[in-house]
UniProtKB/Swiss-Prot annotation:
Its cofactor is Fe(2+). The lineage of its organism: Bacteria, Bacillati, Cyanobacteriota, Cyanophyceae, Oscillatoriophycideae. PROSITE patterns: GLYCOPROTEASE. This is tRNA N6-adenosine threonylcarbamoyltransferase. It catalyses: L-threonylcarbamoyladenylate + adenosine(37) in tRNA = N(6)-L-threonylcarbamoyladenosine(37) in tRNA + AMP + H(+). SUPFAM superfamilies: Actin-like ATPase domain. It comes from Microcystis aeruginosa (strain NIES-843 / IAM M-2473). Keywords: Acyltransferase, Cytoplasm, Iron, Metal-binding, Transferase, tRNA processing.
Amino acid sequence: MTIILAIETSCDETAVAIVNNNLVLSSVVSSQIDLHRLYGGVVPEMASRQHLETINFCLEKAWQETGLNWSEIDGIAATVAPGLVGALMVGMTAAKTLAIVHDKPFIGIHHLEGHIYASYLAESDLKPPFLSLLVSGGHTSLIHVQACGKYQQLGTTRDDAAGEAFDKVARLLNLSYPGGPIIDRMAKDGNPQAFPLPEGKISLPTGGFHAYDSSFSGLKTAVLRLVEKFEPDNLPVADIAASFQDTVARSLTRRTINCALDYGLKTIAIGGGVAANSALRNHLETAAKNHHLTVYFPPLKLCTDNAAMIARAAVDHYDLGHFSDLSIGVRSRLPLSEVMQLYK
């Protein structure tokens, strides 16, 4: 059994967790949503300062919940890429300090690999190879998971990430930040077939369209044009929200199912904040069942950023002897296919 303490500060959640293999011993998340809502999105400098103010509290709370001794901790992990540089620095510095003081190996973790491993916490039988759909405010990717540290990107977004599109459309509808949960709630009272909207396709130079890549900028523009047709007091917010959400869900579902079938992958695992979206869950579950595929969604609390998923990824890296040098820095960008650069 491997016990890891992990820290996640890549964006606007300060999170600390302690995990024993698939068992979450403690998980503390301090969200900054109320702070950034005033500005309609994450302000990087403010996020970094808030991490500095809350990291010690989160560490103390997570530690007290376990009753462990430091001798029982095998390694210390932190998200080091990708993300906001200042925010990442807070978590990485705290983790390195603990690693030095308590003489533990340090394990730098890729944020997207953490989202993949969120499904491992919920499904102990999940084993590679499988297809991972990662959908969040910063990423929309189809990943062929071959092994711990071995990933092949099969599809991505060419412009806005899915979660980013939700936030932008929410602003068009005069809804608050973050847009994803609010649009999901509003859509429950709307008609998803009220307004036909374009899915967004990527043309190939040789003709036809890219099978797995997504585009959401055209969809966002279509919603803008639709909104402009109505007087502000008569805007059918619920119907527009439902139509937009259904279009995104259908687009992601079609690409994901086609990718899984083309690559002969029988299992699909979903990760990232948009994995909490009810329409996406319904569309994917129905389509997977129709094609005799298995689809896993992590619990809602593991869809958004948390440190338990980072710790679970670190468990496998620890068991494989993948440790990071203490001289390693943070990176705002790092392809998941290059994750092994983080280790000695």
